[in-house]
């Protein structure tokens, strides 16, 4: 891998700085499709609410993320950034941001060793300073500091890695501790809080909080309505099929497509495949989600039933081994298998290691079973929309990243209002604010309640309009 790193110019590791001009041109286009972030820049640029914030960012290094980074910087923050997935970086985006002087450590197709090296680097600030905020996607940056600090006290927590990724992570922590036995606890103590982007990372935060292990306050950005009901649903509805088609050129119409999981992500995936006239089958563990799928006209089955019949498989559960080797052995020749959940273990990719692998092109592999049958595995089981395409469109990411920016401001400027070890969601009025910022771009006009109407339903004229338990 021909990474570019030039300490004399800037602190970065990217694939090719010659791509910076291309990245800058795409950033300019993305800004026109990200009204929420641009409005927040305008609102807060003068007051600089993030002045003094040193943000360690671990989130897909895409063009849209570049607009987020430059928004954080415009509001006064200093930022160091790595991608949260080995395949999701857009190299021209990384180069464009590095060219501005913001440290970026991200290359599309980086190794696991490089991934954890780069995640360490977002916590290695110059002049003896340290990060005081984390912006996370999937929880790896948060995990790294907590696990490393535990290992300082008890190295046996690194004794039994459960996967190849854990083996690499544990080795990286041991190597770091050999250089500096207090590396992790020193940095952990400086963190005011984390804002977490995605479902998987949020699950980790709640688990840590319940166990009393979370060392700072957290804001769950994922469960803002203007994130989960937009990014997860409408974003996946457009980016899933983009990834599958770029990877395989498959005709979706008429095929049987299985979507594992019918949460917000699964709903978007099922809608996209159905819109292209696939026969969509859904697997679910939750009777409520299963009933929703059935009443949308989708066939609800088990993976054991579906494996031998379907042409396309998509995992969207956030769970573990949803598709096993046994399932894949039962599949048709040339079945397409992919994942749109955060981690690569929804599909038992490790269980395929002793099969023959044949790369068709980057992030597209034939996995050949002993009987000669082949399946097409996309992005090695990692996020198909980012591994095989460019992820969600800019507009929907503006909504997600507006939430991230507001959450960073909230947690940094009002840190005393948030209890260490607890996980919070943004209040409803901020959720509604994010939605308002995006209406004009779509030509949408809000109606306004009269005082009498507001009194009749018991809400303020200016909102919030729904109680916290409302599900949208």
UniProtKB/Swiss-Prot annotation:
One function term, GO molecular function aspect: adenosylhomocysteinase activity
Protein residues bound to NAD(+): 198-200, 232, 261-266, 284, 319, 340-342, 385
Signal peptide extent: none
Free-text remark on how the cofactor is bound: Binds 1 NAD(+) per subunit.
Compartments where located: Cytoplasm
GO process terms (BP): L-homocysteine biosynthetic process; one-carbon metabolic process; S-adenosylmethionine cycle
PROSITE patterns xrefs: ADOHCYASE_1, ADOHCYASE_2
Cofactor(s) annotated in UniProt: NAD(+)
Associated pathway: Amino-acid biosynthesis; L-homocysteine biosynthesis; L-homocysteine from S-adenosyl-L-homocysteine: step 1/1
Function: May play a key role in the regulation of the intracellular concentration of adenosylhomocysteine.
Family membership: Belongs to the adenosylhomocysteinase family.
Protein name: Adenosylhomocysteinase
Taxonomic lineage: Bacteria, Pseudomonadati, Pseudomonadota, Betaproteobacteria, Burkholderiales
């Amino acid at each position: 891998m021909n990474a570019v790193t030039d300490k004399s110019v800037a602190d970065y590791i990217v694939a090719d700085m010659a791509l910076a001009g291309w990245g800058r041109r795409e950033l300019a286009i993305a800004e026109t499709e990200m009204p929420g972030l641009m409005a927040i820049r305008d609102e807060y640029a003068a007051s600089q609410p993030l002045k003094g914030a040193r943000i360690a960012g671990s989130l897909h290094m895409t063009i849209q993320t570049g607009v987020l980074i430059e928004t954080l910087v415009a509001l006064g923050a200093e930022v160091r950034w790595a991608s949260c997935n080995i395949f999701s970086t857009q190299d021209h985006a990384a180069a464009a941001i590095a060219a501005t002087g913001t440290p970026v450590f991200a290359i599309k197709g980086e190794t696991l060793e490089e991934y954890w090296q780069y995640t360490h680097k977002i916590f290695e600030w110059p002049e003896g300073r340290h990060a005081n905020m984390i912006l996370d996607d999937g929880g790896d940056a948060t995990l790294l500091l907590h696990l490393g600090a535990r290992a300082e006290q008890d190295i046996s927590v690194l004794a039994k890695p459960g996967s190849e990724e854990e083996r690499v992570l544990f080795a990286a922590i041991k190597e770091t501790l050999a250089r500096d036995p207090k590396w992790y606890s020193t940095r952990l103590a400086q963190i005011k809080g984390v804002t977490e982007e995605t479902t998987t990372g949020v699950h980790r935060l709640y688990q840590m909080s319940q166990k009393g292990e979370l060392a700072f306050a957290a804001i769950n950005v994922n469960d803002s309505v203007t994130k989960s009901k937009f990014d997860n649903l409408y974003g996946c509805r457009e980016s899933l099929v983009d990834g599958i088609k770029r990877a395989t050129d498959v005709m979706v119409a008429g095929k049987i497509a299985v979507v594992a999981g019918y949460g917000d992500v699964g709903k978007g995936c099922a809608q996209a495949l159905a819109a292209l006239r696939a026969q969509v089958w859904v697997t679910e563990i939750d009777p409520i989600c299963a009933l929703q799928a059935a009443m949308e006209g989708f066939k609800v089955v088990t993976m054991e039933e579906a494996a031998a019949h379907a042409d396309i498989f998509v995992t969207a559960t956030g769970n573990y081994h949803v598709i096993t080797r046994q399932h894949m052995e039962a599949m048709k020749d040339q079945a397409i298998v992919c994942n749109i959940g955060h981690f690569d273990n929804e599909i038992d990719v490790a269980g395929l290691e002793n099969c023959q692998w044949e790369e068709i092109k980057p992030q597209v592999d034939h996995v050949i079973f002993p009987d000669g049958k082949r399946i097409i595995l996309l992005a090695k089981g990692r996020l198909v929309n980012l591994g095989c395409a460019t992820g969600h469109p800019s507009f929907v990411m503006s909504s997600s990243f507006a939430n991230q920016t507001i959450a960073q401001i909230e947690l940094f400027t009002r840190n005393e209002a948030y209890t260490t070890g607890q996980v919070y969601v943004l209040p409803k009025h901020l959720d509604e604010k994010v939605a308002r910022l995006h209406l004009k771009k779509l030509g949408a006009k809000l109606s306004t309640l009269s005082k009498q109407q507001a009194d009749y339903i018991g809400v303020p004229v200016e909102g919030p309009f729904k109680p916290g338990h409302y599900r949208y």
